[in-house]
Curated annotation (Swiss-Prot):
Organism: Lumbricus terrestris (Common earthworm)
Chain positions recorded as Cu cation A2 binding sites: 196, 198, 200, 204
SUPFAM superfamilies per the UniProt record, alphabetical: Cupredoxins, Cytochrome c oxidase subunit II-like, transmembrane region
Main subcellular location of this protein, as a coarse class: mitochondrion
Enzyme Commission designation: 7.1.1.9
Residues given in the record as Mg(2+) binding sites: 198
Record's function text: Component of the cytochrome c oxidase, the last enzyme in the mitochondrial electron transport chain which drives oxidative phosphorylation. The respiratory chain contains 3 multisubunit complexes succinate dehydrogenase (complex II, CII), ubiquinol-cytochrome c oxidoreductase (cytochrome b-c1 complex, complex III, CIII) and cytochrome c oxidase (complex IV, CIV), that cooperate to transfer electrons derived from NADH and succinate to molecular oxygen, creating an electrochemical gradient over the inner membrane that drives transmembrane transport and the ATP synthase.
Subcellular location: Mitochondrion inner membrane
Subunit structure as annotated in this protein's UniProt entry: Component of the cytochrome c oxidase (complex IV, CIV), a multisubunit enzyme composed of a catalytic core of 3 subunits and several supernumerary subunits. The complex exists as a monomer or a dimer and forms supercomplexes (SCs) in the inner mitochondrial membrane with ubiquinol-cytochrome c oxidoreductase (cytochrome b-c1 complex, complex III, CIII).
Descriptive protein name: Cytochrome c oxidase subunit 2
PROSITE patterns associated with the record: COX2 (PS00078), COX2_CUA (PS50857), COX2_TM (PS50999)
Residue ranges annotated as Mitochondrial intermembrane topological domain: 1-26, 82-228
Keyword Repeat: no
Length: 228
């Protein structure tokens, strides 16, 4: 969960989010180096009292400021493409969860099990218990086994939604008539909250997401005792 006044990411709870945080630090380092060099160049030119009005070309400088930005973009693009490939490529998922966005709630279908499907609505303030989070708690959480690869198949029944859980590093558009796929693996038990991140109508702010990660034994027990 984010804290009041927090300026950085939430604690990473998936392998993908750990890599996203690492890539953020990598990109920020490159950005700092670029700003330092540009700032130094500007300051040096402003303080330089020597003026040459007859410079018509500078092949060496033009070569440097063409090749150097290309190399910097390459340094940023390669790790970014790697993470993008990892999130889209789901090789051996343990379970598949089909997620459907509605105005204004989510539906979850566990396709590997019979009749394990549910709708997930936001809990009104009057139903909250002490310690619950306002506008984030739901009546039915999406339960997943931790440390196992989960495949999400995401679509929508009406308008475009976006299924987003920051701690897991997951953000996928739910588009009517289209099935999007993403994979993630939770690294620790807990409850991770998110919200629809695509404006979808009057109650867009009131369709939260709650993902509960538990151990495999508890998950199988939950499936066995599940009542639609």
């Amino acid at each position: 969960m984010p804290n009041w006044g927090q300026v950085m990411f939430q604690d990473a709870a998936s392998s993908v989010m750990l890599q996203l945080v690492s890539f953020h630090d990598h990109a920020l380092l490159v950005l700092t180096l670029v700003l330092t060099v540009v700032g130094y160049a500007l300051l040096a030119l402003m303080l330089n009292k020597q003026v040459n009005r007859y410079i018509m070309e500078a092949q060496t400088v033009e070569t440097i400021w063409t090749i150097l930005p290309a190399l910097i973009l390459l340094v940023l693009a390669l790790p970014s493409l790697r993470i993008l490939y990892i999130t889209d490529e789901v090789s051996q998922p343990s379970i598949t969860v089909k997620t459907i966005g509605h105005q204004w709630y989510w539906s979850y279908e566990y396709t590997d099990f019979l009749n394990v499907e549910m709708d997930s609505y936001m809990l009104p303030t009057s139903d909250l218990l002490p310690g619950d989070y306002r506008l984030l708690e739901v009546d039915n959480r999406m339960v997943v086994p931790m440390q196992l690869e989960i495949r999400m198949l995401i679509t929508a029944a009406d308008v475009i939604h976006s299924w987003t859980v920051p701690a897991l590093g997951v953000k996928v558009d739910a588009v009517p008539g289209r099935l999007n796929q993403i994979g993630f693996t939770t690294t620790q038990p807990g409850v991770f909250y998110g919200q629809c991140s695509e404006i979808c109508g009057a109650n867009h702010s009131f369709m939260p997401i709650a993902v509960e990660a538990i151990n495999t034994k508890s998950f199988m027990s939950w499936v066995s005792n599940f009542k639609p």
